[in-house]
Amino acid sequence: MGRKWNNIKDKKASKDANTSRIYAKFGREIYVAAKQGEPDPESNQALRVVLERAKTYNVPRTIIDRAVEKAKGGSEENYDELRYEGFGPNGAMVIVDTLTNNVNRTAADVRAAFSKNGGNMGVNGSVAYMFDATAVIGLEGKTSDEVLEILMEADVDVRDILEEEDAVIVYAEPDQFHAVQSALKDAGVEEFTVAELTMLAQNDVTLPEDAQAQFEKMVDALEDLEDVQQVYHNVDLGE
């Protein structure tokens, strides 16, 4: 799979820790999920996914409760979910998922982040076909064989189970996210190191050092945008 999920999450968490911007992004995502469906995660699968992700980033309960209460209160603030696709230095492929209340602003900001850092926006579908929507669940304290046995006994199908450093990472279809977590929770797993619905590149590429530095700068510029929720790409950053 080419991705060290714990390293990626740790890098993002350490980068975001000083600014708390990750909390703001989660607050927005939780609000949108709660507003679009029921504010109860038991009956709202989209909200449950966001809350499970938030746990792995240690998002404070106050942030979560505030976002849910805002949705319950009938706030008129509306957000559109928009996806942008584009290319970075050396043709690297990038997908940007956003939640925005101003489409024109977001489109201009995303375009500028690409163009100022050696990239360019593409049309819809220009790179998405090279990525697979994937549920990624990480845990510690069990071997891959033990996890496989748990999932087989629960009759849950997954794509792959890999040991990455001290963790076991399960890759599955997006609609199996809850089934995987439920089976593992029933088997005594109380905490997950990774809980993501992501776009996973079918093939990773490596870039020359100068191009990689420029690419990382571009990704940072995209992630710094208030409306950007997720940035997916096909570059092996070597972490």
From Swiss-Prot:
Gene3D superfamilies: 1.10.10.200, 3.30.70.980. It holds the Pfam family TACO1_YebC_N. One of its GO terms (cellular component) is cytosol. GO terms for biological process: regulation of DNA-templated transcription. It comes from the Bacteria. Keywords: Cytoplasm, DNA-binding, Transcription, Transcription regulation. It is found in: Cytoplasm. Transmembrane segments: none annotated. HAMAP family: Transcrip_reg_TACO1, Transcrip_reg_TACO1_YeeN. Belongs to the TACO1 family. YeeN subfamily. This is Probable transcriptional regulatory protein BCAH187_A0615.
